[in-house]
Amino acid sequence: MIVGRHIIAELYGVKEELIAKEEVVRSIVEEVVDKAELTKVGSVYKQFNPHGVTGIVLIAESHVSIHTWPEYGLVNLDIFTCGDTSKVEKAFKLFLEKFKPESYRHYVLDRG
């Protein structure tokens, strides 16, 4: 029995200006959640000094989290839904469009 889909991804070679500041990361994540038609319940973001961001969006279907390391051009993403699994794929594609990584690797897990 499959109850959800989980994508874990590492994006490499992301431009620093896209991932260094909380307000930019927040804007991208919130837009992706909205466009992927995920049901946002709440969110928390943390700006690190001198740069880097962690954010978690609680969605009714599960969660989306992001961790950034601008000094390495690195973004770690975690997207999980126990709802419509196509929304996870849509969210991941939107993140790729927004962050434009030079390369990435990702794992797709069917949960359950």
Swiss-Prot record:
The active site is at S62 (schiff-base intermediate with substrate), H67 (proton acceptor), C82 (proton donor). It comes from the Archaea. Pathway: Amine and polyamine biosynthesis; S-adenosylmethioninamine biosynthesis; S-adenosylmethioninamine from S-adenosyl-L-methionine: step 1/1. GO terms for biological process: spermidine biosynthetic process. Keywords: Autocatalytic cleavage, Decarboxylase, Lyase, Polyamine biosynthesis, Pyruvate, S-adenosyl-L-methionine, Schiff base, Spermidine biosynthesis, Zymogen. Its cofactor is pyruvate. InterPro entries: AdoMetDC_fam_prok, S-AdoMet_deCO2ase_core, S-AdoMet_deCOase_pro-enz. The modification Pyruvic acid (Ser) is found at S62. GO terms for cellular component: cytosol. Is synthesized initially as an inactive proenzyme. Formation of the active enzyme involves a self-maturation process in which the active site pyruvoyl group is generated from an internal serine residue via an autocatalytic post-translational modification. Two non-identical subunits are generated from the proenzyme in this reaction, and the pyruvate is formed at the N-terminus of the alpha chain, which is derived from the carboxyl end of the proenzyme. SUPFAM superfamilies: S-adenosylmethionine decarboxylase. GO terms for molecular function: adenosylmethionine decarboxylase activity. Binds 1 pyruvoyl group covalently per subunit. It catalyses: S-adenosyl-L-methionine + H(+) = S-adenosyl 3-(methylsulfanyl)propylamine + CO2. The record marks E61, S62 as: Cleavage (non-hydrolytic). Its EC number is 4.1.1.50. Belongs to the prokaryotic AdoMetDC family. Type 1 subfamily. Heterotetramer of two alpha and two beta chains arranged as a dimer of alpha/beta heterodimers. Catalyzes the decarboxylation of S-adenosylmethionine to S-adenosylmethioninamine (dcAdoMet), the propylamine donor required for the synthesis of the polyamines spermine and spermidine from the diamine putrescine. PANTHER family: S-ADENOSYLMETHIONINE DECARBOXYLASE PROENZYME. This is S-adenosylmethionine decarboxylase proenzyme. It comes from Archaeoglobus fulgidus (strain ATCC 49558 / DSM 4304 / JCM 9628 / NBRC 100126 / VC-16).
